[in-house]
Curated annotation (Swiss-Prot):
The reaction(s) this protein catalyses: desulfo-A47934 + 3'-phosphoadenylyl sulfate = A47934 + adenosine 3',5'-bisphosphate + H(+)
UniProt binding sites for substrate: H43, L44, E45, G46, W132
Name under which the protein is recorded: Desulfo-A47934 sulfotransferase
Gene disruption phenotype: Deletion mutant produces desulfo-A47934 but not A47934.
Record-annotated active site: H67
Stored SUPFAM superfamilies: P-loop containing nucleoside triphosphate hydrolases
Effect recorded for S98A: 60% decrease in activity
Species whose genome carries this gene: Streptomyces toyocaensis
Biological role: Catalyzes the sulfonation of desulfo-A47934, the final step of A47934 biosynthesis. Also has weak activity in vitro with teicoplanin aglycone and teicoplanin.
Effect ascribed to mutating F77E: 90% decrease in activity
Gene3D superfamilies to which the protein is assigned, alphabetical: 1.25.40.460, P-loop containing nucleotide triphosphate hydrolases (3.40.50.300)
């Protein structure tokens, strides 16, 4: 199968993990360094930053990841050549908490945590974070790659994958992705999962730092690079920031907004 195959996800949804497993599956080898993930399943934003971009009409299958919403102008070049989309979706509650950890903000710094939570709830996503660009709000991103995807990519087939299901049954869910993308048979799926556990990815991240290779962790003002790979926490309470934060988030989940709609649709309206 020729054409563009997108691994689309909102930031902090587990995209690096899925890309690592796909890279290991395709190559049949462990991913030894952080740049190996980018080499295996490139992130479009990283390519654009380096002045590169895939062909708009590839004569082979191309796996490409992005946090962009599907309707971003830069993606119009791939309108006709996009064949498949894997949309990776994570509980927005946990994505928000993952951002706090990524920024090196401990739960004890309640004021800083509250600021991120209040902004996330108000924006329904990360638009004010200024780490990424073009990702839109959480519901905008999901809608663009699922319900509205054919407005941007009329020929695309779509597979939605929940991060939580990938954590619960990584072999089963990775096989669904591999089969959907027509990458090959089931042989190699178990090895790809074993090669990309969170522990292995932490080791890979640290090894890459020691080798002076680029990783994704943010830099502190003191020049220390924070770890990118966390523990993949799920369904954590927001009450450590105050009952008002938990209530504000609950109100967002149970409103009549697109955020509430997609939270209900994917099982996050707890």
């Amino acid at each position: 199968m020729n054409g563009m195959c997108w691994i689309a996800s909102y930031p902090k949804a587990g995209g690096h993990w899925l890309r690592c497993m796909l890279t290991s599956y395709v190559t049949g080898e462990p991913v030894e360094t952080w740049p190996g993930i980018q080499a295996g399943v490139p992130h479009l934003e990283g390519l654009l930053r380096d002045g590169e971009a895939p062909s708009a009409d590839p004569d082979e299958q191309v796996l490409l990841a992005t946090h962009f919403t599907a309707d971003r102008p830069v993606l119009r070049f791939y309108r006709e050549s996009t064949a498949k989309v894997v949309c990776l979706i994570r509980n927005p509650r946990d994505a928000m908490l993952s951002l706090m950890r990524m920024k090196g903000i401990p739960p004890e710094d309640v004021e800083a945590c509250r600021k991120i939570a209040e902004t996330f709830i108000a924006d329904e996503g990360f638009s004010s974070v200024r780490i990424w660009a073009g990702e839109g709000s959480w519901p905008e991103n999901i809608r663009s790659w699922t319900d509205s995807v054919h407005e941007s990519f009329p020929n695309a087939a779509v597979l939605a994958v929940r991060y939580e299901d990938l954590r619960k049954d990584p072999e089963g869910e990775l096989w669904k992705v591999v089969d959907f993308l027509e990458l090959g048979g089931r042989d190699g799926v178990a090895d790809a999962v074993a090669n990309c556990t969170l522990e292995r990815m932490r080791e890979m991240e640290e090894r890459s730092k020691l080798l002076g290779l680029e990783t994704t962790g943010l830099m502190t003002r003191g020049g220390k690079q924070l770890p990118f790979v966390g523990k993949g926490g799920q369904r954590k309470s927001l009450k450590f920031m105050g009952d008002d934060i938990e209530k504000a988030y609950a109100d967002l989940l149970h409103g009549e907004t697109d955020f509430a709609h997609y939270a209900r649709l994917y099982g996050y309206a707890e």
